Design a protein with these regions (language model features):
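Short, acidic, metal-binding catalytic loop of nucleotide-sugar glycosyltransferases
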Residues: 3, 21-37
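Conserved, well-structured core segments
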Residues: 7-11, 39-40, 144-146, 174
Length: 183
């Protein structure tokens, strides 16, 4: 099991522009020689009944047993988090999109200054949305999501409460609110 400070799990798909953007990202991150950082690109795929996921360590591609449809992002995210817990010893999980650039040097400073002393980390760029005439929901954008291992474990433990009718970043915020986890 690889041990890293930062595990970057990039949600992607086999559709345009995600595939193009992921290929560009791989040029930046795949050859990263820092052993304290790891990048993995995950998507849904056509796996057979006996496989939950397949990981290609050379290309850092993780295929998950779920649809690659954009409305299945929540399921893809939960399965990717399960894979992460089972296969990588990490302190922080960064969940960007294929069009995001992650500055690991900046993150190291952020961890030290603001996150290392927290029990549960749910952080990133905060946005607000209103839906279905309900109160405003504050959420962390899926392009900049930062979680610690304890938060990822909590998400997996409570995955039955995930609202799959919402985009995954909004559904995650709803779950964090229900669990009384603050930004």
């Amino acid at each position: 099991m690889q041990n890293v400070q930062s595990l970057m799990m990039i949600i992607t798909s086999d559709t345009y522009p995600a595939k193009r953007n992921s290929n560009t990202q791989k040029k930046l991150y795949k050859e990263n020689k820092n052993t304290n950082e790891m990048a993995v690109w995950y998507s849904g795929g056509g796996l057979d009944q006996n496989e939950k996921f397949i990981y290609d360590s050379l290309n850092r591609d993780l295929k998950l047993k779920c649809s690659d449809d954009s409305r299945q992002m929540g399921q893809k995210t939960i399965l990717a988090f399960e894979w992460a817990i089972e296969n990588v010893d990490f302190k922080y999980l960064i969940r960007p999109t294929p069009s995001s650039f992650v500055n690991f040097s900046y993150l190291k400073g952020l961890y030290k200054e603001k996150l290392d002393d927290k029990d549960i980390v749910y952080a990133g760029t905060v946005q607000t949305i209103e839906y279905e005439n309900k109160p405003k929901l504050i959420f962390v954008s899926g392009s900049t999501l930062i979680l610690n291992k304890q938060c990822v474990e909590l998400i997996i433990k409570n995955q039955n409460k995930w609202d799959h009718s919402l985009w995954d970043d909004v559904a995650l915020s709803k779950l964090m609110t229900e669990l009384e986890i603050k930004l």
